Amino acid sequence: MSFKCIFLTGGVVSSLGKGLTAASLALLLERQSLKVSMLKLDPYLNVDPGTMNPYEHGEVYVTNDGIETDLDLGHYHRFSSVKLSKYSTATSGQIYARVIKKEREGVYLGSTVQVIPHITNEIIEVILECARENQPDVLIVEIGGTVGDIESLPFLEAIRQFRYEHAENCFSIHMTYVPYLKAAGEVKTKPTQHSVQSLRSIGIIPDAILCRSESSLSPDVKKKISLFCNVPNNAVFNVVDIEHSIYEMPLMLSQENISTFITEKLGLFTKQEDLSDWKTLVERLRNPSLDKVRIGLVGKYVQHKDAYKSVFEALTHAALSLNSSVEILPLDSEDPHFLETLEQCDGCLVPGGFGSRGWEGKITAAKLCRERGIPYFGICLGMQVLVVEYARNVLRLEKANSTEMDAETPDPVICMMDGQASLVATGGTMRLGAYPCLISPGTKVHEAYGESEVMERHRHRYEVNFDYVQQFKDFGLNVVGTCPQQGLCEIVEIENHPWMIGVQFHPEFLSKLIAPHPLFVGFIQAAILYSRNKSYVQA
């Protein structure tokens, strides 16, 4: 085997931060001059999260090749330079579908198809496919869920077999939670012990245990975990709950020397990672500038921040790059009083979404921003909100709407894309992935990008109806970005407004701490200017 493989499992509780841990490890290993690839294995039976409720699963992250994935892949992107694609994710639903397809094609020659060996072999094949496609020095494989879940068992068995065949090239990290009981005044290691016992009963002996806790574990506690979990004392690592920013995680792991421990065990003798630039950025996040802007994020899933995870992070990246900080106020567009809060904000962002719930509230938000000169950034559905509001209140097309919200509207300024109406399946059938966009010169968007052609990622079925484009232009709303392949409207911009822009794509998927997205930077710049001078009056 030409690559090394790091397996990351979790125990005790869910939401431990395995995705952040995997992403942070990728950063540390890359800073040691290693080429890293990543794979997320999710035990749920959905083929992908594309049709899952955001309240249940969080946002859907889209790759360049149009794969709808778990939000953890967003962490992978933001922390590292790993290339993400269809080879970077697999679910139980996909694995079972592949096996059933092979059975129907006669690949198994009449054998009884079983979880072992057929499902486990397919999981191993997914791991090898990822390695073959990317040719990494190190492949990090994160297994979703918690040890003990029934759904996880085939994945853990596959890992056991893989480690048995390639023991010298594999490293297993088990992440657990060590709770602090206030009444007893001490931390409890028993949940970690039981979790490791469950993992060992499957046949996987972890090479390291990563313990998450509220505060630092004492050497005695680490020694106890080492003794009862049968791992060396120097293989017990600790990360505490993050105080300020998720971007502190790589620094915590670096302080624990976990990446050095891993590379030495795998025989990868590399240089010490250099995180000086990362430390500088994190220090600025810990000590934010006094120049702060308030951004109202108007949506319908605002009670669950993970539903807009990439948007939150992209705003943070942009503000940091401008030596500013951002306070994000989630505003429910169904709340009858949300406009009172939005009026006090320095900018408004309406993110992507689907369905009519909260639609009219978003339109009132766009109207407020247009009339008051508040910077407005509409993403996907947020762009469609901008267009419909403008049609109703500037073009005086009072019943203008999107056909998604009103199929009988007399003025369908937003309509379904050609070819979408005939589709029966909903999963994986939208316009997905990266497409080129040509940007008009002399526009705010061109000024932000500094170039005339960009690639951006999409996830939508509806588009601006080109039958209305000239009318919009006559009244000051311009299409300033188009797809050269399909002639679709990708970006709109309003004249005589400080910053009111809508994009059909999802720029948040490309933003990183070390490389903020230019449109988010432009938006925050406009919000800073607005916060300093709120005397704008619409012409």
Swiss-Prot record:
UniProt: Mg(2+) binding residues: D72, E142
The UniProt record lists the keyword Ligase: yes
Residues annotated to bind UTP: S14, K188, T189, K190, P191, T192, Q193, K224
GO biological processes: 'de novo' CTP biosynthetic process; pyrimidine nucleobase biosynthetic process
Enzyme class, broadest EC rank: ligase
InterPro entries: Class_I_gatase-like, CTP_synthase, CTP_synthase_N, GATASE, GATase1_CTP_Synthase, P-loop_NTPase
Protein's pathway: Pyrimidine metabolism; CTP biosynthesis via de novo pathway; CTP from UDP: step 2/2
Residues annotated to bind ATP: S15, L16, G17, K18, G19, L20, D72
Binding site for L-glutamine: Y55, G353, L381, G382, M383, Q384, E404, R461
One cellular component term from this protein's GO annotations in UniProt: cytosol
UniProt-annotated binding residues for CTP: S14, D149, I150, E151, K188, T189, K190, P191, T192, Q193, K224
Superkingdom of the source species: Bacteria
Active-site positions on this chain: C380, H506, E508
Coiled-coil residue windows: none
Reaction catalysis annotation: UTP + L-glutamine + ATP + H2O = CTP + L-glutamate + ADP + phosphate + 2 H(+); L-glutamine + H2O = L-glutamate + NH4(+); UTP + NH4(+) + ATP = CTP + ADP + phosphate + 2 H(+)
UniProt keyword annotations, A-Z: ATP-binding, Glutamine amidotransferase, Ligase, Magnesium, Metal-binding, Nucleotide-binding, Pyrimidine biosynthesis
Record domain Glutamine amidotransferase type-1: where: 294-533
Regulation affecting activity: Allosterically activated by GTP, when glutamine is the substrate; GTP has no effect on the reaction when ammonia is the substrate. The allosteric effector GTP functions by stabilizing the protein conformation that binds the tetrahedral intermediate(s) formed during glutamine hydrolysis. Inhibited by the product CTP, via allosteric rather than competitive inhibition.
Segments for region (Amidoligase domain): 1-268
GO molecular function annotation: ATP binding; CTP synthase activity; glutaminase activity; identical protein binding; metal ion binding
Enzyme Commission code(s) on record: 6.3.4.2
Note: CTPSs have evolved a hybrid strategy for distinguishing between UTP and CTP. The overlapping regions of the product feedback inhibitory and substrate sites recognize a common feature in both compounds, the triphosphate moiety. To differentiate isosteric substrate and product pyrimidine rings, an additional pocket far from the expected kinase/ligase catalytic site, specifically recognizes the cytosine and ribose portions of the product inhibitor.
Known partners and oligomeric status: Homotetramer.
Family per record: Belongs to the CTP synthase family.
Entry function: Catalyzes the ATP-dependent amination of UTP to CTP with either L-glutamine or ammonia as the source of nitrogen. Regulates intracellular CTP levels through interactions with the four ribonucleotide triphosphates.
Protein name: CTP synthase
Source organism per UniProt: Chlamydia felis (strain Fe/C-56) (Chlamydophila felis)
Lineage: Bacteria, Pseudomonadati, Chlamydiota, Chlamydiia, Chlamydiales
